[in-house]
Amino acid sequence: MKHLQAVTAILLIAATGFAADGPCVIPQRGYFRIHVSTGGLFGAFAHDHSIEAQKITGCASVDPANISHSAIKLTFTTADIRVIDPKESAKDRAQVQKTMETEVLKILEYPQVVFESTGIETAGGNQLRVSGNLTIRGKTQPVMIPLTFTRMNDGTLQANGKYSFKQSAFGIKPIQIGGGTVKVKDELETEFEVFLK
């Protein structure tokens, strides 16, 4: 049960305005990363991209008697998301960053991405399934996020997971260039690793 109480905090990334009744994420450790793939006629000649929310903080509100009554809220600012493509030139990376901020995330109009849980359940062993509502660019969709957690020798909890979502579900039109000969795929792959204590 102690494992479950602690791990419910794991998906709280840059949380604000949320009660800290449980363990908290260790700042400046771990990552929250989104992989963006390209397609289209000349998609094979284009670069895939990775973007990352590099500041990870937050805590959980935990019900020790019933894990399903625990709560998770995830909030991080869109302005803190960075393009981390190591193979791109600084100029190209800056252009991708600008496109992401102005056309995809529209950070001035939508400064936050929010995840708020609606249910937590065990999935056997060290697995959890966290259901909730994800809000991007003001549009909310239900999601389910699976995660795996491990207790380290010093008591720190390490958790990681992967999930995917479609940009179009949140009213985002995938970027296209060259008349659609190169375009960003609608589905984005997301992975995270978080440490808390």
Ranges and model annotations:
Residues 14-16:
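N-terminal signal peptide c-region/cleavage motif recognized by signal peptidases
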Residues 19-197:
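Low-complexity, acidic/polar, glycine-enriched regions of mature
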Residues 1-7:
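Bacterial N-terminal signal peptides that target proteins for export
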